């Protein structure tokens, strides 16, 4: 793990640059490209972004981190508490005066790590609070659902933590964007490490979160490990937010597997 070093300043720089680049120039509408026809085009001196994150549910810890990062990015965009970071960017597009001269305001929603709740909160932020862009989320199921809504409403969706191949693959939308890597990339990147650390003669057992990310994560890791020569003993789906995984232990122990692969995230990963 020591080979991969991330520092706080570098992460913040990347986050602010990405957020500004995505938020600033994009105003799209279903079936139209004229800027003055954009959905929720701001007419005053502020522009509103919608931060749709899990504030409850099994991925709430990740949502809290996301929201803190978004709030910090807004301060940077508005030139509040920047600490001189913007001046270190090679691009000078960010001036600390908001987006295109408009001060950035934000509203928030709780996805609850549920697709229906996430759509409802995104719709409220768009229709009632004038959000010009929706971003956030820690579940690929949520990401797919919300980007579908944003497609219908002509609003940009910048996905948060979505790792499923399908977000910008099978379920891609014109108004949906991602900065996060996907499950395929994880599988390809892990291959050489797994071979070096564990060899090519292993028997793997998968416990997998039962939704789009878990499915594509399992598939991608299986493709990699089987390509190394590993045998896949079993793949077992588990509900998101299961909490207690003790019922799954005995089958794993009796399977003959010597590697357990947990395709889990958030509190489910901690518990499993």
Question: For the regions a protein language model found, what residue spans apply to each?
Answer:
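Short beta-strand segments enriched in small/hydrophobic residues
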Residues: 46-67, 204-207
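Signal peptide-proximal N-terminal region
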Residues: 68-105
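Short, well-structured alpha-helical segments in soluble
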Residues: 112-130, 245-256
